[in-house]
């Protein structure tokens, strides 16, 4: 009953701060641009190590995720880590769920090195961007791999980049 009045009041009060309304789709794009993880990245299979957050797990005191972080399988050097991806040909669309295969290799399970978890068109950058996981991602920045979508019979060459597409230092965020 009071929703419209509240909305109008918030817009009115926010005018001096250049506040504008935006929807959840815009929020989703902004979180990908900023490299923030959400449901597609934290799906029950990911650990702090996958997300590049292992230094936040206390080695001295008990903490959530501490026991899991000590398991041998999660401490391998080839673990898939959160990375950013952008198409080499900027006009190409990316597809969430695409598998990541090194250039020149066949798209087989043995050659699968990761996947694109979240994709959006970035109006700020003017092209598609993606978050995803790829083996040793943090050491492969600048490398080009293939994003393969077998359901649509589509292969797109992508570059591995930082998952922080916009304002990586947080200057805009902090003002």
Enumerate the language-model features and the residues they cover:
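Conserved, structured C-terminal
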Residues: 1-175
